[in-house]
């Protein structure tokens, strides 16, 4: 009986809503606007920030495409169980910025370069497809859609070396993070660039936001005589809070870092470049490309190459995740003058520890632009054969480490065929000698033509390699005319896996 009475009493407390036809539905309980959680990453009506990381995986777990003639950089697929899925990236999202760099009007290759250069962590600013299309019409430009930090307002990566006064900071006492730093005037931390009152985000590449005070002290003690801190000053913390942007490590600028990448511009001599590229496991346990057997007096040695250097980029493009053969192809594609970015073992150890790419910390380094010409050295597995048709040829392609063949197709509704609109230097397509403007007649033995074939082409290209293409004669004049048409639709055989 007492239980029944309690139930009746509770029922009397239930609020009731009476519909008023003159006022319409004005029930506060049904107000969706008030119930929206502005910190919810699934709130698709505004730009979202996705901080992705490569832990055990080799990639972030999403595929990127761009339509020719449009400024859209579209997430066309998100792999299940990856960082991209866990952080809320969705199929159809438009990428507005990479690490605070607005990419709305950048070329597709530039966006891919930004993401790959970010290394094991990247911050993407994205917007849902339907919201992006409406907002672009209303705003007239993607730049107004993308919230960014002002110039000079960044988290800082500071390397602090202990002196007679210690590290020169104390930590605000609390049972658990977040923590803020109190600096000693003229101390080691202040000299290393730590701003006063900074929030402590990471110690030696590991987040301390959820550590207890005792755990943090133990971590600092284990650092020995030097420690690398990721911190955010008061202005940075305030700006990120206003934008809803995470205090992310890929946004950081380096202060007093113990190591940095080096750019080597090497011109081939009569005896070659004078070094050997070898694939082996690095300090992080992952395969990488390392430089050995640097011959004294030859161009590589004169440019400053040291045995044991790790190759980070070729012509400014990251080689992280590339296999040995593809890396060699990219170097050969440079011809007689190559631009390499390298790190020595000490720098490699440092950037592996902080889990950031050395390419984020290049200082006033001139990087030679990648050439447009493809290499003439063709590996055995990517070949071109004459075809029975006059003016046509047949080629067999194998996908690279990222799953792509290194080219993009374009079709126009009013056009009679498909043609190659872009070739990635160093990719299997470039190695096979294909060029922009080549028309595609057959794929894996099936004739193609026009935009009605895209669904079938997608199925064909998902089949087991090699990919067999029959190509017609090159038509650069027709290519230029087709690209200028607004009815043109771009289609990618294999999107970039990032």
From Swiss-Prot:
The record's subcellular location field reads:
Cell membrane; Cytoplasm
The protein's PTM annotation reads: Phosphorylation at Ser-329 negatively regulates its interaction with SLC26A3.
Look up the domain of life of the source: Eukaryota
Summarize subunit and interaction data from the UniProt record for this chain.
Answer: Interacts with the C-terminal region of GUCY2C. Interacts with C-terminal region of SLC9A3 and the interactions decrease in response to elevated calcium ion levels. Interacts with the C-terminal region of SLC34A1. Interacts with USP2 isoform 2. Interacts (via the third PDZ domain) with SLC26A3 (via PDZ-binding motif). This interaction leads to decreased expression of SLC26A3 on the cell membrane resulting in its reduced exchanger activity.
Q: Which organism is it from?
A: Mus musculus (Mouse)
**Phenotypic consequence of residue 329 to A:** Loss of phosphorylation. Significant increase in interaction with SLC26A3
Q: Domain PDZ, which positions?
A: 49-130, 157-235, 263-346, 394-475
A cellular-component GO term for this protein:
apical part of cell
- GO MF term (any one): guanylate cyclase inhibitor activity
Q: Return the protein name.
A: Na(+)/H(+) exchange regulatory cofactor NHE-RF4
Name the membrane topology term.
Answer: Peripheral membrane protein
Task: Give the signal peptide range.
Answer: none
Residues where Phosphoserine is found: 329
Please state, per the UniProt record, what induces or represses the expression of this protein. Answer: Isoform 2: Expressed in a circadian manner in the intestine.
**Tissue localization of expression:** Expressed in kidney and small intestine. Not detected in heart, brain, spleen, lung, liver, skeletal muscle or testis.
Q: Which SMART domains match?
A: PDZ (SM00228)
Q: Please explain the role this protein plays, according to its UniProt record.
A: Acts as a regulatory protein that associates with GUCY2C and negatively modulates its heat-stable enterotoxin-mediated activation. Stimulates SLC9A3 activity in the presence of elevated calcium ions.
């Amino acid at each position: 009986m007492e239980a029944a009475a309690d139930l009746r009493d509770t029922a009397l407390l239930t609020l009731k809503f009476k519909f008023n036809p003159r006022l319409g539905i004005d029930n506060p309980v049904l107000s969706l606007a008030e119930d929206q959680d502005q910190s919810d990453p699934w709130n698709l009506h505004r730009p979202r920030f996705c901080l992705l990381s490569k832990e055990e995986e080799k990639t972030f777990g999403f595929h990127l495409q761009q339509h020719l003639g449009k400024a859209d950089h579209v997430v066309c697929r998100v792999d299940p169980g990856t960082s991209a899925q866990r952080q809320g990236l969705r199929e159809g999202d438009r990428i507005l910025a990479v690490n605070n760099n607005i990419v709305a009007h950048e070329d597709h290759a530039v966006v891919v370069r930004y993401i790959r250069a970010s290394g094991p962590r990247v911050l993407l600013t994205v917007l849902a497809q339907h919201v992006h299309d409406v907002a672009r019409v209303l705003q007239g430009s993607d730049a107004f859609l993308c919230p960014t930090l002002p110039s000079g307002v960044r988290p800082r990566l500071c390397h602090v070396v202990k002196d007679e006064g210690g590290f020169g900071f104390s930590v605000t006492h609390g049972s658990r993070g977040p923590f803020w730093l109190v600096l000693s005037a003229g101390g080691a931390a202040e000299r290393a660039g730590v701003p006063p009152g900074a929030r402590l985000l990471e110690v030696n590449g590991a987040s301390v936001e959820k550590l207890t005070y005792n755990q943090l002290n133990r971590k600092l003690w284990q650092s020995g005589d030097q420690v690398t801190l990721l911190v955010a000053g008061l202005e940075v913390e305030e700006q990120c809070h206003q934008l809803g942007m995470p205090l992310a490590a890929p946004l950081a600028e380096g202060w007093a870092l113990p190591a940095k990448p080096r750019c080597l511009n090497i011109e081939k001599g009569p005896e070659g470049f004078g070094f050997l590229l070898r694939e082996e496991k690095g300090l992080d346990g992952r395969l990488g490309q390392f430089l050995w057997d640097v011959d004294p007096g030859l161009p590589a040695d004169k440019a400053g190459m040291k045995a044991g250097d790790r190759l980070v980029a070729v012509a400014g493009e990251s080689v992280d995740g590339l296999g040995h053969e593809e890396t060699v192809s990219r170097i050969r594609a440079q011809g007689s003058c190559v631009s390499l970015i390298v790190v020595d073992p000490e720098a490699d150890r440092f950037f592996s520890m902080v889990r950031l790419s050395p390419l984020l910390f290049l200082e006033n380094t001139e990087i030679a632009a990648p050439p447009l010409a493809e290499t003439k050295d063709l590996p055995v597995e990517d070949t071109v054969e004459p075809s029975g048709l006059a003016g046509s040829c047949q080629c067999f392609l194998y996908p690279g480490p990222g799953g792509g063949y290194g080219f993009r197709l374009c079709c126009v509704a009013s056009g009679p065929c498909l043609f190659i609109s872009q070739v990635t230097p160093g990719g299997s397509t470039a190695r096979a000698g294909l060029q922009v403007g080549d028309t595609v007649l057959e794929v894996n033995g099936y004739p193609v033509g026009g935009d009605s074939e895209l669904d079938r082409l997608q199925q064909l290209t998902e089949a087991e390699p090699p990919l067999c293409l029959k190509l017609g004669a090159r038509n650069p004049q027709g290519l230029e005319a087709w690209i200028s048409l607004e009815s043109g639709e771009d289609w990618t055989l294999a999107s970039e896996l990032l």
